[in-house]
């Protein structure tokens, strides 16, 4: 088990995500540490360009697809941080992205994705309905789907 973990850490360290993300610091959370009488540290992924760790997985997956399969258009479904990660990654790699988001997605998330020049399709009342529409769109147009969580290259 440890050997596999070490291989995985090496794979992460060699990842090309550092083309677009920072090596975010780990900082002591003083008030939390005092409250819980223990040292509590925070990994500052809020300092990433999209203010979330989700950009790491999105960029890793898309960069691998561009490199291996020369894709020029990707699709995802998300109501938030993954959508922003895919949009940012697509823009950085100069490819198209279509993002399916539930109609209930906060407007600030929709606007952030649009700012990155991705096409946004608001559909359905929840994530599952947006996901279903995205998968149908991928099948019809023969495009790769970037799953927000069910893909080892995204985790």
Q: Which residues does each PLM region occupy?
A:
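PLP-dependent amino-acid enzyme catalytic core
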Residues: 1-155
């Amino acid at each position: 088990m440890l050997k596999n973990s070490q291989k995985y850490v090496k794979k992460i360290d060699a990842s090309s995500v550092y083309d677009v993300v920072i090596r975010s610091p780990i900082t002591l959370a003083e008030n939390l540490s005092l409250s819980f009488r223990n040292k509590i540290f925070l990994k500052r992924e809020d300092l990433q360009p999209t203010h979330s760790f989700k950009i790491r997985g999105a960029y890793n997956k898309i960069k691998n697809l561009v490199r291996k399969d020369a894709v020029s258009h990707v699709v995802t479904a998300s109501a938030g941080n993954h959508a922003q990660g895919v949009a940012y990654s697509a823009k950085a790699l100069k490819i198209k992205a279509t993002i399916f988001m539930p109609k209930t997605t906060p407007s600030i998330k929709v606007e952030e994705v649009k700012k990155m020049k991705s096409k946004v399709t608001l559909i359905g009342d929840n994530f599952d309905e947006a996901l279903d529409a995205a998968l149908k769109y991928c099948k019809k147009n023969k495009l790769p789907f970037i799953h927000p969580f069910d893909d080892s290259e995204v985790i």
